[in-house]
Swiss-Prot record:
<dbReference type="InterPro" id="IPR050106">
    <property type="entry name" value="HistidinolP_aminotransfase"/>
</dbReference>
<dbReference type="Pfam" id="PF00155">
    <property type="entry name" value="Aminotran_1_2"/>
</dbReference>
<keyword id="KW-0808">Transferase</keyword>
<dbReference type="GO" id="GO:0004400">
    <property type="term" value="F:histidinol-phosphate transaminase activity"/>
</dbReference>
<dbReference type="GO" id="GO:0000105">
    <property type="term" value="P:L-histidine biosynthetic process"/>
</dbReference>
<keyword id="KW-0028">Amino-acid biosynthesis</keyword>
<dbReference type="GO" id="GO:0030170">
    <property type="term" value="F:pyridoxal phosphate binding"/>
</dbReference>
<dbReference type="InterPro" id="IPR015422">
    <property type="entry name" value="PyrdxlP-dep_Trfase_small"/>
</dbReference>
<dbReference type="InterPro" id="IPR005861">
    <property type="entry name" value="HisP_aminotrans"/>
</dbReference>
<dbReference type="InterPro" id="IPR015421">
    <property type="entry name" value="PyrdxlP-dep_Trfase_major"/>
</dbReference>
<dbReference type="InterPro" id="IPR004839">
    <property type="entry name" value="Aminotransferase_I/II_large"/>
</dbReference>
<keyword id="KW-0032">Aminotransferase</keyword>
<comment type="subunit">
    <text>Homodimer.</text>
</comment>
<dbReference type="InterPro" id="IPR015424">
    <property type="entry name" value="PyrdxlP-dep_Trfase"/>
</dbReference>
<comment type="pathway">
    <text>Amino-acid biosynthesis; L-histidine biosynthesis; L-histidine from 5-phospho-alpha-D-ribose 1-diphosphate: step 7/9.</text>
</comment>
<protein>
    <recommendedName>
        <fullName>Histidinol-phosphate aminotransferase</fullName>
        <ecNumber>2.6.1.9</ecNumber>
    </recommendedName>
</protein>
<keyword id="KW-0663">Pyridoxal phosphate</keyword>
Length: 374
């Protein structure tokens, strides 16, 4: 890029380090000569069962309509969510993944260096990325045992604070705050500060906080949810926010027309009806979590007890273990980009996927031990 063009690029964008997603199966297949069917991906917390059969059936019945623009309002999905959540459709804002709702919050509430955003040290990387993209100052609040320090977050609120992000359960640590502590925090946050509670993994929590009740009584609470995890629709990019009707109207104004495609809306609507798929997903998640924890204990690997569908585990050198497993056709997630260089995050897969992981992981650990500088 010439200096003349570079001078026109926003300074905040020049400094931005792009988000690094989990390695795609297709990339690994090209690099190592694997067939895609030989590869297991345990990096991005996707549902190993895939989408609901009802979603696949609905997609098949509607493929012939893709020459038409989608419903820009998302009427049927909003109505389904309204029934599912027991909240008015006017409280719901659809997004191209819940990431888009995060971006919309910045468009509406925090757009320049006069504002400020708060989030935890080991929080979802997109909060920081969006703050940097918009040129908004931010404070990373130190964690307590890999969890949110809500007391410190309250104390950090200042006159410039516009947005607070709390992922619960948190990604990438898998930790959650107690319902009581969260309720107390929400009651104490000033009315003019928006609190975005990112509940991407809330479907895996047996006793979830009743955060929607706060949306019904306060304008400054926004709930973020996704169909990418429990519902297995990550590739269709569909999520939503739940906010007061007043806030929802402004989020709607900020979004692009037709921001959620027709197939995503159709699949998400059908997925909400499939209780059996959700129960089966929960079953393999809990069984797989127990199995991984038992094996990590046996291998002497410290891990963070998780309330989500993944586990953060200490392996000594996350990049080394990540690369060693890649050579065996297994994709996990190195946590170096999160400042957790000695850790990897592992999605809880199917029984067969975990068997293969647990066969190769000890060999990767042994290789690290033998190659570690003395």
């Amino acid at each position: 890029m010439t200096n003349k063009i570079l001078s026109q690029v926003k300074p905040s964008l020049q400094r931005l380090i792009p988000y690094e997603p989990g390695k795609p199966i297709e990339d690994l297949a090209r690099e190592y000569g694997f067939s895609p069917s030989q590869i297991i991906k345990l990096a991005s917390n996707e549902n190993p069962l895939g989408p609901s059969p009802r979603a696949l059936d609905a997609l098949g019945r509607n493929l012939h309509k893709i020459h038409l623009y989608p419903d820009g309002y998302g009427y049927y999905l909003k109505e389904a969510l309204s029934h599912h959540l027991d909240i008015d459709a006017e409280n719901i804002v659809l997004g191209n993944g819940s990431n888009e709702i995060i971006e919309l919050l910045f468009h509406v509430f925090a757009t320049n260096e006069e504002d400020e955003v708060l989030f935890s040290k080991y929080a979802f990387a997109v909060y920081k990325l969006m703050a940097e993209l918009f040129g908004v100052p931010f404070k990373e609040i130190a964690d307590v045992s890999f969890n949110h320090d809500l007391k410190a977050m309250l104390e950090a609120i200042g006159p410039k604070t516009k947005l607070i992000f709390i992922a619960n359960p948190n990604n990438p640590t898998g930790t959650r705050v107690s319902n009581e502590d969260l309720y107390l925090f929400l009651e104490r946050v000033p009315d003019e500060v928006i609190v975005a509670i990112d509940e991407a993994y809330i479907d895996f929590v047996p006793d979830p906080p009743q955060t929607l009740s706060f949306v019904k009584k306060r304008d400054n609470i926004v709930i973020l949810r996704t169909f990418s995890k429990m519902y297995g629709l990550a590739g269709l990019r569909i999520g939503y926010g739940v906010a007061s009707k007043y806030v929802a109207r402004y989020l709607e104004r900020a979004r692009q027309p037709f921001n959620t495609n027709s197939l995503a809306q159709i699949a998400a609507t059908a997925s909400l009806e499939d209780t059996q798929h959700r129960l089966l997903t929960l079953k393999i998640t809990e069984e797989g979590k127990k199995r991984l924890e038992e094996n990590f204990d046996r291998l002497g690997l410290p891990f963070i007890p998780s309330s989500a569908n993944f586990i953060l585990v200490h392996v000594g050198d996350g990049d080394f273990i990540f690369r060693a497993l890649l050579k065996k056709g297994i994709i996990v997630r190195s946590m170096k980009s999160y400042g957790l260089a000695e850790w990897v995050r592992i999605t809880i897969g199917t029984e067969d996927q975990l068997s293969r992981l647990l066969e190769e992981l000890p060999l990767a650990l042994l290789s690290f031990k033998n190659n570690r500088p003395q």
